């Protein structure tokens, strides 16, 4: 509570409130007030109980009565208590001083450290960029992650949805995108946790700090235990900070929202408390307007771009749910994380066949990129269809063409795995940033059959494709060294010994090669190469 009081005082100390009212009714997070002199306008912030209770005006019921939504807990609030008008809307601090810090919806730091702000505060209620300022040029937002850049490229200044359950690597993937954004593109990352658990937010803060990406990052949290009004406004607060870096600092911003469904859920709670008539499946009637008010502020302008990656929860896996339908209409790319791929050890566990992007067209990504992505998806789809035949009849029953498809598809799957910088402390594997050009070149060489003779393990957890050649070269040199050590010397060959009845140039019967041995060894090696990777490897 002390943080909230300090933040409110910092926001409005230059404009002390003069207008006062009284509490008329308290119904959970909805508080009705009466102002006899001047009714505060919509979105004005009010406070009571020595600024410990913060309210926001959402409706004017009459000439003297207004309805507010509580942004803090309303314990202790009673009828007849005085309420002061702050004279302005909800504001948050902006500027370079916010970097590496964690804030709540009021702009108060919640990371346990003192905050020295530079006096720049901005309202969370901002209009979307004008159409004349929005850049119409479509550009790819390069993440450095092979499977994302090749198969489902993200749009610079666009919105991407990340669908995944618990334990499939969703947070790790978001963390890696933050790391690559800061280290490779010199941008700013903002993480907005809507309805996050306290434990998850604390763990993410420590992971970002240990990964060394916190210096160019801002974190905001509207925690799960907070009132719906706080969770409903935290997304707007994060966008206000992102817009400052885009418009004033002329920087590219990566905005990560987890979870956009909880934003919709908070709006539904507010709508129900206000007594609005629910729409289909119990959602608020203003669902489309509220979501558009948040999503339309994420745009690519001439000064910079705000690129958003949003975690989306689909209730009961029903993609016809109104929350999912309205969210899909704003997304330009969809990343689906597969639990099956995660259990097989393919990290990142992005499903290449279910993920898609609106930018995957020849006019945007280019003809070469489009052809490579189409061929990769075609081979992976054919391999997926052949899995049942392989399980029942075996690989030997396939034609030569189908065996080539299986071999190259499995090598593509392993090539799309990639060690991350944010997991170096857990895997002891150095992270890799792979450019789009390197990823496309690797896919082309695999599709052309250049790596058909290489073991599948050589392509697992590597960066660019040339790293797969080094293990084979080192293995060849090792075998050559072993063969030279086993070769008898001249002195040993000329040493006296028992005479053999066979001529000198004859091959002993015990050393004669078995004709069936090469085929057997080749088949065993082929079967061995088709084994699934172990978890974590």
From Swiss-Prot:
<dbReference type="InterPro" id="IPR027417">
    <property type="entry name" value="P-loop_NTPase"/>
</dbReference>
<dbReference type="InterPro" id="IPR017691">
    <property type="entry name" value="Alt_ATPase_F1_bsu"/>
</dbReference>
<keyword id="KW-0067">ATP-binding</keyword>
<feature type="binding site">
    <location>
        <begin position="164"/>
        <end position="171"/>
    </location>
    <ligand>
        <name>ATP</name>
    </ligand>
</feature>
<keyword id="KW-0997">Cell inner membrane</keyword>
<keyword id="KW-0139">CF(1)</keyword>
<comment type="similarity">
    <text>Belongs to the ATPase alpha/beta chains family.</text>
</comment>
<keyword id="KW-0547">Nucleotide-binding</keyword>
<dbReference type="InterPro" id="IPR020003">
    <property type="entry name" value="ATPase_a/bsu_AS"/>
</dbReference>
<keyword id="KW-0066">ATP synthesis</keyword>
<dbReference type="InterPro" id="IPR005722">
    <property type="entry name" value="ATP_synth_F1_bsu"/>
</dbReference>
<protein>
    <recommendedName>
        <fullName>ATP synthase subunit beta 1</fullName>
        <ecNumber>7.1.2.2</ecNumber>
    </recommendedName>
</protein>
<dbReference type="InterPro" id="IPR003593">
    <property type="entry name" value="AAA+_ATPase"/>
</dbReference>
<keyword id="KW-1003">Cell membrane</keyword>
<dbReference type="InterPro" id="IPR036121">
    <property type="entry name" value="ATPase_F1/V1/A1_a/bsu_N_sf"/>
</dbReference>
<dbReference type="InterPro" id="IPR004100">
    <property type="entry name" value="ATPase_F1/V1/A1_a/bsu_N"/>
</dbReference>
<dbReference type="InterPro" id="IPR000194">
    <property type="entry name" value="ATPase_F1/V1/A1_a/bsu_nucl-bd"/>
</dbReference>
<keyword id="KW-0472">Membrane</keyword>
<feature type="compositionally biased region" description="Polar residues">
    <location>
        <begin position="473"/>
        <end position="498"/>
    </location>
</feature>
<dbReference type="InterPro" id="IPR055190">
    <property type="entry name" value="ATP-synt_VA_C"/>
</dbReference>
<comment type="function">
    <text>Produces ATP from ADP in the presence of a proton gradient across the membrane. The catalytic sites are hosted primarily by the beta subunits.</text>
</comment>
<dbReference type="InterPro" id="IPR050053">
    <property type="entry name" value="ATPase_alpha/beta_chains"/>
</dbReference>
<dbReference type="Pfam" id="PF22919">
    <property type="entry name" value="ATP-synt_VA_C"/>
</dbReference>
<feature type="compositionally biased region" description="Polar residues">
    <location>
        <begin position="507"/>
        <end position="528"/>
    </location>
</feature>
<dbReference type="GO" id="GO:0046961">
    <property type="term" value="F:proton-transporting ATPase activity, rotational mechanism"/>
</dbReference>
<dbReference type="GO" id="GO:0005886">
    <property type="term" value="C:plasma membrane"/>
</dbReference>
<dbReference type="Pfam" id="PF00006">
    <property type="entry name" value="ATP-synt_ab"/>
</dbReference>
<dbReference type="GO" id="GO:0046933">
    <property type="term" value="F:proton-transporting ATP synthase activity, rotational mechanism"/>
</dbReference>
<keyword id="KW-0406">Ion transport</keyword>
<feature type="region of interest" description="Disordered">
    <location>
        <begin position="471"/>
        <end position="537"/>
    </location>
</feature>
<comment type="subunit">
    <text>F-type ATPases have 2 components, CF(1) - the catalytic core - and CF(0) - the membrane proton channel. CF(1) has five subunits: alpha(3), beta(3), gamma(1), delta(1), epsilon(1). CF(0) has three main subunits: a(1), b(2) and c(9-12). The alpha and beta chains form an alternating ring which encloses part of the gamma chain. CF(1) is attached to CF(0) by a central stalk formed by the gamma and epsilon chains, while a peripheral stalk is formed by the delta and b chains.</text>
</comment>
<dbReference type="Pfam" id="PF02874">
    <property type="entry name" value="ATP-synt_ab_N"/>
</dbReference>
<keyword id="KW-0375">Hydrogen ion transport</keyword>
<dbReference type="GO" id="GO:0045259">
    <property type="term" value="C:proton-transporting ATP synthase complex"/>
</dbReference>
<dbReference type="InterPro" id="IPR024034">
    <property type="entry name" value="ATPase_F1/V1_b/a_C"/>
</dbReference>
<dbReference type="GO" id="GO:0005524">
    <property type="term" value="F:ATP binding"/>
</dbReference>
<dbReference type="GO" id="GO:0016887">
    <property type="term" value="F:ATP hydrolysis activity"/>
</dbReference>
<keyword id="KW-0813">Transport</keyword>
<keyword id="KW-1278">Translocase</keyword>
């Amino acid at each position: 509570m002390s943080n909230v009081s300090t933040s409110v005082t910092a926001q409005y100390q230059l404009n002390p409130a003069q207008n006062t009212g009284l509490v008329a009714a308290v119904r959970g997070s909805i508080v009705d007030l009466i102002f006899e002199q001047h009714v505060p306008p919509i979105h004005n912030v009010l406070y009571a109980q020595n600024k410990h209770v913060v309210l926001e005006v959402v409706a004017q019921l009459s000439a003297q009565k207004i309805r507010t939504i509580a942004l803090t807990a309303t314990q202790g609030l009673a009828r007849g208590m005085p309420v002061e008008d702050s004279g302005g809307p909800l504001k948050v601090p902006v500027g370079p001083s916010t970097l590496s810090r964690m804030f709540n919806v009021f702009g108060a730091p919640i990371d346990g450290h003192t905050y020295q702000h530079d006096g720049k505060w901005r309202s969370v209620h901002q209009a979307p960029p004008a159409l004349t300022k929005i850049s119409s040029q479509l550009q790819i937002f390069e993440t450095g992650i092979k499977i994302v850049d090749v198969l489902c490229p993200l749009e610079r200044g666009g919105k991407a949805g990340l669908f995944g359950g618990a334990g499939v690597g969703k947070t790790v993937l978001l963390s890696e995108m933050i790391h690559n954004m800061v280290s490779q593109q010199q941008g700013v990352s903002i993480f907005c946790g809507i309805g996050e658990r306290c434990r998850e937010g604390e763990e993410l803060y420590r992971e970002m700090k240990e990964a060394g990406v916190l210096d160019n990052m801002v974190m905001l949290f509207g925690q799960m235990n907070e009132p719906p009004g706080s969770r409903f406004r935290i997304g707007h607060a994060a966008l206000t900070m992102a817009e400052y870096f885009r418009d004033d600092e002329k920087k590219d911003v990566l905005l990560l929202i987890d979870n956009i469904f909880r934003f919709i859920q908070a709006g539904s709670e507010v709508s129900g408390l206000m007594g609005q008539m629910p729409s289909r499946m119990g959602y608020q009637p203003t669902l489309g307007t509220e979501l558009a008010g948040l999503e339309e502020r994420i745009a690519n302008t001439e000064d910079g771009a705000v690129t958003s990656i949003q975690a989306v929860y689909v209730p009961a896996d029903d993609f016809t749910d109104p929350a999912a339908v309205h969210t899909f209409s704003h997304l330009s790319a969809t990343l689906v994380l597969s639990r099956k791929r995660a259990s097989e050890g393919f990290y990142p566990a992005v499903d290449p066949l279910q993920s898609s992007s609106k930018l995957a067209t020849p006019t945007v990504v280019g003809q070469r990129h489009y052809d490579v992505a189409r061929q990769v998806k075609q081979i992976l789809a054919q391999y997926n269809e052949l899995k049942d035949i392989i399980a029942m009849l075996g690989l030997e029953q396939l034609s030569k063409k189908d065996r080539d498809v299986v071999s190259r598809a499995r090598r593509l799957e392993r090539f799309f795995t990639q060690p991350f910088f944010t997991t170096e402390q857990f895997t002891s594997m150095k992270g890799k940033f792979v450019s789009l050009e390197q990823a496309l070149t690797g896919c082309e060489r695999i599709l052309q059959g250049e790596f058909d003779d290489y073991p599948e393990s050589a392509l697992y957890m590597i960066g660019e494709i040339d790293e797969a050649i080094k293990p084979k070269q080192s293995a060849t040199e090792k075998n050559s060294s072993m063969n030279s050590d086993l070769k008898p010397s001249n002195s040993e060959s000329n040493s006296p010994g028992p005479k053999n009845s066979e001529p000198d140039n004859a091959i002993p019967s015990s050393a004669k090669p078995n004709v069936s041995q090469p085929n057997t060894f080749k088949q065993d090696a082929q079967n061995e190469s088709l084994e699934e990777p172990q978890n974590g490897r």
